[in-house]
Amino acid sequence: MELIAVFDFDGTLIKKDSMILFFLRYFDLSIKNLPNFCRLILETLKYFLKIYSQKQFKEKYINLIIASSRLKDREALFKDFSKYLLEMVFKTAKKKIIEFKKNGYKTILLSASPDLYLEKISKGLGFSELICTRTAYIDNRTVISSLNCYGNNKIKMLLNKYKEDRVDWEGSYCYTDSQSDRGLLNLFGNPHIVNNIRFGKKNPDFKSVIWK
């Protein structure tokens, strides 16, 4: 049976949310781009009013930022963003990934964030596999081509690749900061909450760790 070590990305391997960082780094806040900014506010309101699903909003959000960016080469944009995020990864996390690989674990990056930048990050950190929200480029726009890898979908997508009878769950590890991953943590014999003291206090059965 396989031993696996699963890592979330946003808030776990890096301190902040990568989708917010994507906006801050690439959205052009000039007067010329005001129509796109207004549209982004409108799309965000529709999401919070539950007119859009998280998957629909994510797709619109990504496309609006790409359209407004001063960096017009799509491939160059995501290459730059991957490099930027890699520099933010906690040193503790990097050591853990290396340690698990040395001990024969299959290391998995499991995230709701898109493959647009996670592919390069996953390779850069030496992960065995990436399971995330998948995208395709169709008619000059990015579309989400898989399930949104969030909440219960994370569990579904993980178990799709790693059948329950194939994995030594009791000996395997999971690291996340997100309360939406509570069900995911319950699969593992070694569940860890990263850098979220409040979540840890509510769930004393999970081990809390601080990564820097």
Each PLM stretch: what is its role?
Residues 56-92:
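Metal-dependent phosphoesterase signature
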Residues 2, 83-212:
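C-terminal cap/substrate-recognition subdomain and adjoining C-terminal extension
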Residues 53:
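Glycine-rich adenosine-cofactor-binding loop
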Residues 1-50:
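Active-site neighborhood of HAD-like aspartate-dependent phosphohydrolases
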